[in-house]
From Swiss-Prot:
Main location: membrane
Name of encoding gene: DEP3
Pfam families: MFS_1 (PF07690)
GO CC annotations, alphabetized: plasma membrane
Chain segments annotated as transmembrane: 44-64, 78-98, 109-129, 139-159, 172-192, 199-219, 242-262, 268-288, 319-339, 351-371, 373-393, 410-430, 439-459, 515-535
GO molecular function ontology, one term from the record: transmembrane transporter activity
Induction: Expression correlates with the production of depudecin with high levels on oat grain medium, and minimal levels on oat flower medium and complete medium.
Residues with glycosylation annotation: N399
Keywords from the named record: Cell membrane, Glycoprotein, Membrane, Transmembrane, Transmembrane helix, Transport
Protein name: Efflux pump DEP3
Bilayer topology annotation: Multi-pass membrane protein
Protein species of origin: Fusarium langsethiae
Domain of life: Eukaryota
Amino acid sequence: MSEQSTLAGPYTEKPGVESQNPTGDGKASFDETSPRDIHGWRWAIAYAAMLSTTFLFALDNTIVANIQPSIINDFGHLELISWIGTGFALGTMFILLWGKIYGVFNIKWVYIFNILLFEVGSAVCGAAPNIQALIIGRVIAGIGGSGMYSGTLTYVSVLSNQKEKPAYLAGSTVVWGVGSVVGPVVGGAFAASSATWRWGFYINLPIGAVFAPAYMILFPNWDPNPTLTLAEKFRLVDWINAVIFLAGSACLTVALTFGGVVYSFNSGTIIALWTVTGVLLVAFIVLLKLHPLVSKENRLYPLHFFKQMTLINMQLQVFLASGIILAMTYYVPLYFQFIKGDGALQAGVRLLPLIMFMVAFSMVNGFLMPKYGLIPIWYIVGSALTLIGSALMYTIDENTSNGNVYGYNILVGAGAGCYIVAGFAIVQSLVPTHEIANAVGAMTISQDLGMVLFLAICGSLFHNVAVDKVGKALPSASETEIGNLIAGTSSSAFQALSEADKDLVIPEIASAMKSIWAFFMAAAALSFVCSWPLFKTKLGGKKVEASVVV
């Protein structure tokens, strides 16, 4: 099979629709012919159904930010609290595999399978009898959610021409932003109500049910390889390296999450996890080069991408920006709960400045960058604002006004919004048409890795530093008691403290959070430094004629 037919996958154009970038020279050509057969109200409903999955995916990314203390109150196991968020993010590591699968199998049925998987995971979370079952449900939902997200990108790519695509993807940006904004608020509202935190997961079921007829009836059948048998299609997927990649991601996440929390950093378990991670990484790279069962064009990640420094830079930038934003959605509400005494619902509302400005500036970038270019400026200004905002967050304590915290959050949100999604457009100008699927897949996996690793690192940082500082403030408390205290203000351990002890604990928790803001500063500084080489990047002219995705 030719490279075009196997790699183009979901990005293969219909006859009469011109290639976006056949040479990879950074210049795009356009044909206003619509590549889809569905129009009018049928297309409007189908597109709305796609946006519903984007909304649910975004909602689930942030909804647990405010309900974790309630979950710990019910189940205990504080040492596993970070896995409520990390488990979902770890499940999204499947997005690299889903991108390949969408390029081989019928898009509609892969998409519907992922919707079902997401709903099953949500049901498992809502009905979970213990925290272990909840984490398993979160992983399942993450796997399905990443498949839905990849499916939306795929459908928009094959069902819209280059003139339409920015508008349709801008709609996805808005819906994703709305889902991210309301996630902590909805989660906090459920946690504070008689419905309990379980409805933070059950809510996905009725929304999915409403759009189910559209999924089944209106989603177009699109098979990128209609002449191949099922067995031939399976042979086009790099299953071995997919398993190695997922196993390595899991080992790395466990090592980062449990190190210093469940096991000491120098314990045999943590050392073994790091060793296995390293071995799997080497095996992954070797198989990218020398895989005996899969052709070069069908391997999980194109090895020659490592030689394209701008593409690697784009992956690093989305890794850093996405990690900062998602981790902020977890720790800004925690700050307001501990330091300002907010309830779960009110703390969730405090995220609005961060998320709204991030979404607004993402949309501004999506509409202006394709017209005016200035790619390095977006990255330099954006990373600088993120760095300044993170540095100012490092200065906050229990006496900082809410207005100041909002202002610092706005800087971080606006800064990240300037470039968090820009790379998705840029990479499509760096590669030939038949490799756009691979380039977008590389960006999405970098985005998800950033979210997974930042949550894991921040969870470990906060737990270790807070236990040490609070332990000094309350020398008579055991490490287990201290761990329960820092789970959140709604935890029974924190509520049981006297007002005098709370006055001792709260400043120490604010101080412990400085480790997280410092980590964000380092990440933003790296992003800023790596933005300057973009001035030397040739993208085929001042304009980037490509779509932007979230």
